[in-house]
């Protein structure tokens, strides 16, 4: 700060003035700035400036003494008048004003710029003016100017008439006596402010005598490391002028080996770009389908039957024993449903032909083992050994079944392809693979798509269970189970019927009548294996009205029932049709109350006492 030029003033720190009263007495006023301001933090402008202000530190303290005559008698305590000091802010350095800016605009000074005089005994008996609440809005170099104003109470202490007009400048109640200026001090920004210092001895002394001064007993200075060069912005700007001029120049197009940057000339990095694509492996889709080349490599390693591999529907996905495909380096998410891979062309992967099975045995002697391949019990052979049963391999029949019950193939141990499989307890025959193909579909397929039934395994392996294998992803589904032949079926005709489903337990547990869809005709699988219909049971049309099933309903019509078309009537049911009535007498429960529900159904309630 020594190199900076400040505006010189005559009344810095000390100032004095003398006047003559009406009775000819000479009164001298002397002011001295006992405590100079040293630093302040700029509080800025806006709503938050008043809430976060830092006062000028330390608080300025100005001392006033009044003397009378040439003997300089101290009349500070005996002078009958009121005194107050008004503080203003001035620039300590010359500032060039911008164009259009008013030269009379002063820096903004906030806080309490006015202080009244207090009489204190220490450090010396005198009048003191204390400014504990002064703040500056902008950073820079400033000085404070203090102006003393006097309000006289005794008429004899007033100035002479000719001097009073010049001093007051009109009819005024107060008179300006003198002015004193403080030493220059620096106002820092919030970032560079070093902090408030500990309260001075003078501030403590004034506070002990009852004046309102904030006392700080701890050091609150901020430790800031000096810059490496110790240079201010002005010197730094001069040193870096050449470098900034170089950076703003246009680069020379003839220079190829170097490039120009704001920080100078640097040599480009000669290292070539890496050719590794390891960082792109994680960008692939998790559920990407393998390409035809990948499918071909997988299909050449094991025998196939021209069908699409199966994707398990459970939450735990199975991967191939030799790792994921080349385009997928990370295992797929366990909770993302995988898309099934593309099905390879059927003519390219033809199923192998198996030899004819051994001579068959009768249905009564041969039990029906579970369906399997290789080391699992196979289905019973057909009645005639000379006839070869051919089954159609269809992706439609494969996809239409329930895949959760599908047992996979457990192949013999092979090098590099054997994995532990998850055992599944034996269950009933899965419906997805016991449903045979219709004859019309088999006639449309080429002969190369048929294969013979595998030979039956030894009886010792009949108790083994089917299991899930990881090879199931690239192998076809198991062959359909051998159909069961009835005794009245001709030997020369191939039957695709299976044993009938036992529905006795299902019917006994039902609490309501079957819907019309349950009694509708089904496919050949169910039609051939059903038991003969009991003639003593009533049909659906005898008990319930099926008129609204066939007749169309137009324009908001609802099912309407005539007198003879009621859902439950006592006249349509005869006593002979009811299995529960052994006698020919009419059941009283049929003569109960009849009413119709909102959905059109007719409800019957039995008579009291006959329920």
Curated annotation (Swiss-Prot):
Record-annotated Velvet domain positions: 24-216
Disordered, as annotated region: 1-57, 222-497, 511-611
Transcription regulation listed as a keyword: yes
Localization per Swiss-Prot or TrEMBL: Nucleus; Cytoplasm
GO terms for biological process, alphabetical: sporulation resulting in formation of a cellular spore
Ranges of compositional bias, category Low complexity: 242-254, 330-340, 362-377, 435-452, 461-471
Matches recorded under Gene3D superfamilies: Velvet domain
InterPro entries: Velvet (IPR021740), Velvet_dom (IPR037525), Velvet_dom_sf (IPR038491)
Extent of Polar residues compositional bias: 14-23, 274-290, 419-434, 511-533
Keyword field: Cytoplasm, Nucleus, Sporulation, Transcription, Transcription regulation
Region (PEST): 455-499
Gene Ontology CC: one annotated term: nucleus
Function description: Component of the velvet transcription factor complex that controls sexual/asexual developmental ratio in response to light, promoting sexual development in the darkness while stimulating asexual sporulation under illumination. The velvet complex hat acts as a global regulator for secondary metabolite gene expression. Controls the expression of the dothistromin gene cluster. Regulates hyphal growth and pigment formation. Acts as a positive regulator of virulence.
Domain topic, free-text comment: The C-terminal PEST domain is a region rich in proline, glutamic acid, serine and threonine residues that is required for the light-dependent regulation of development and secondary metabolism.
Assembly mode: Component of the heterotrimeric velvet complex composed of laeA, veA and velB; VeA acting as a bridging protein between laeA and velB.
Protein name from the UniProt record: Developmental and secondary metabolism regulator veA
Gene, per the UniProt record: veA
């Amino acid at each position: 700060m020594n190199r900076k030029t400040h505006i010189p003033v005559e009344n810095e720190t000390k100032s004095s003035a003398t006047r003559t009263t009406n009775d000819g007495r000479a009164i001298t006023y002397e002011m001295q700035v006992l405590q100079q301001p040293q630093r302040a933090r700029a509080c800025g402008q806006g709503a938050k400036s008043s809430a976060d202000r830092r006062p000028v530190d330390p608080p300025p303290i100005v001392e006033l003494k009044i003397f009378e005559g040439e003997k300089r008698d101290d009349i500070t305590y005996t002078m009958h008048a009121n005194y107050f000091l008004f503080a203003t802010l001035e620039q300590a350095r010359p500032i060039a004003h911008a164009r259009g800016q008013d030269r009379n605009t002063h820096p903004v000074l906030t806080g309490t710029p006015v202080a009244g005089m207090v009489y204190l005994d220490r450090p010396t008996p005198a009048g003191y003016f204390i400014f504990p609440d002064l703040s500056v809005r902008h950073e820079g170099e400033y000085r404070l100017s203090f102006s003393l104003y006097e309000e006289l109470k005794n008429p004899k202490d007033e100035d002479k008439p000719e001097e009073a007009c010049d001093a007051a400048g009109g009819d005024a109640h107060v008179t300006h006596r003198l002015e004193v200026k403080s030493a220059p001090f620096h106002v820092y920004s919030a970032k560079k402010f070093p902090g408030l210092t500990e309260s001075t001895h003078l501030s403590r002394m004034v506070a002990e005598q009852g004046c309102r001064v904030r006392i700080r007993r701890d050091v609150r200075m901020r430790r800031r490391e000096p810059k490496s060069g110790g240079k201010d912005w002005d010197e730094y700007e001069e040193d870096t002028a050449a470098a900034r001029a170089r950076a703003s120049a246009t680069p020379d197009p003839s220079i190829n080996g170097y490039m120009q940057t704001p920080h100078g000339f640097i040599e480009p990095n000669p290292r070539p770009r890496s050719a590794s694509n390891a960082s792109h492996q994680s960008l692939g889709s998790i559920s990407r389908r393998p390409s035809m080349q990948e499918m071909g490599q997988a299909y050449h390693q094991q025998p196939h039957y021209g069908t699409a591999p199966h994707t398990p529907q459970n939450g735990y996905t199975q991967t191939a024993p030799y790792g994921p495909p080349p385009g997928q380096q990370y295992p797929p998410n366990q909770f993302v449903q995988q898309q099934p891979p593309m099905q390879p062309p059927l003519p390219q992967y033809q199923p192998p032909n198996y030899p004819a099975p051994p001579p068959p045995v009768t249905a009564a002697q041969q039990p029906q083992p579970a369906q399997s391949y290789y080391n699992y019990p196979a289905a019973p052979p057909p009645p005639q050994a000379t006839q070869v049963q051919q089954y159609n391999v269809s992706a439609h029949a494969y996809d239409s079944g329930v895949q959760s019950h599908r047992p996979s193939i457990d192949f013999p141990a092979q090098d590099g392809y054997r994995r532990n499989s998850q055992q599944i307890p034996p269950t009933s025959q899965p419906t997805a693979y016991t449903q045979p193909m219709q004859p019309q579909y088999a006639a449309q397929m080429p002969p190369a798509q048929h294969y013979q039934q595998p030979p039956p395994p030894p009886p010792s392996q009949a108790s083994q269970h089917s299991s899930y294998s990881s090879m199931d992803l690239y192998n076809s589904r198991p062959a359909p189970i051998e159909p069961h032949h009835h005794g009245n079926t001709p030997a020369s005709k191939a039957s695709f019927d299976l044993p009938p489903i036992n529905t006795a337990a299902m019917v006994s547990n039902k609490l309501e009548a079957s819907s019309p869809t349950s009694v509708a005709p089904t496919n050949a699988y169910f039609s051939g294996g059903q038991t003969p219909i009991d003639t003593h049971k009533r049909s659906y049309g005898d008990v319930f009205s099926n008129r609204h099933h066939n007749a169309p309903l137009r324009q908001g019509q609802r099912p309407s029932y005539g007198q003879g078309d009621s859902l439950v009537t006592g006249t349509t049911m005869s006593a002979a049709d009811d299995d529960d009535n052994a006698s020919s007498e009419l059941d009283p429960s049929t003569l109960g109350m009849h009413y119709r529900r909102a959905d059109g159904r007719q409800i019957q309630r039995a008579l009291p006492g006959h329920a």
